[in-house]
Swiss-Prot record:
InterPro entries: CheY-like_superfamily, Sig_transdc_resp-reg_receiver, ST_Response_Regulator. The keyword Phosphoprotein applies. CDD domains: REC_CheY. The modification 4-aspartylphosphate is found at residue 53. This is Protein CcdB. The keyword Phosphoprotein applies. Transmembrane segments: none annotated. Residues 3-118 form the Response regulatory domain. GO terms for biological process: phosphorelay signal transduction system. It comes from the Bacteria. It comes from Bacillus subtilis (strain 168). Keywords: Phosphoprotein, Two-component regulatory system. SUPFAM superfamilies: CheY-like (SSF52172).
Length: 120
């Protein structure tokens, strides 16, 4: 079973993503509300996949992505963002994010991204 770390500063978004993934039989390994928590939890939990917001307090998703990939260059991270700025998305992909989801999103978009990244 695929274990996922869900990262978003908005609790309702973490809940929404968790519900979508659990309904599809993914296991939620943990949740974080900022990038610093995300990087720390990644090191402790070693999930198979991370869904991560970009705009967060303390440490944003781009900085957390860098930290996670420094620790584990093979980490699979899907960035979630309400920002439609191509520059930010391009930066995340160039750093090593495997995919991205634009908020607001439909359940199918989340599952399609997870499936692409996990190869199923």
């Amino acid at each position: 079973m695929t274990r996922v770390l869900v990262v978003d500063d908005a609790k309702f978004m973490r809940v929404k993503i968790r519900e979508i993934l659990e309904e599809a039989n993914y296991i939620i390994a943990g949740e974080a509300a900022d990038g610093e928590q995300a990087a720390d939890l990644y090191k402790k939990l070693r999930p198979d996949l991370v869904t991560m917001d970009i705009t967060m307090p303390v440490k944003n998703g781009i900085k957390a992505l860098r930290d996670i990939l420094t620790f584990d260059p093979k980490a699979k991270v899907i960035m979630c963002t309400a920002m439609r700025q191509q520059r930010i998305v391009t930066e995340a992909i160039e750093l090593g994010a495997k995919d991205f989801i634009v908020k607001p999103f439909e359940e199918t978009k989340v599952l399609e991204a997870v499936s692409r990244v996990m190869g199923h």
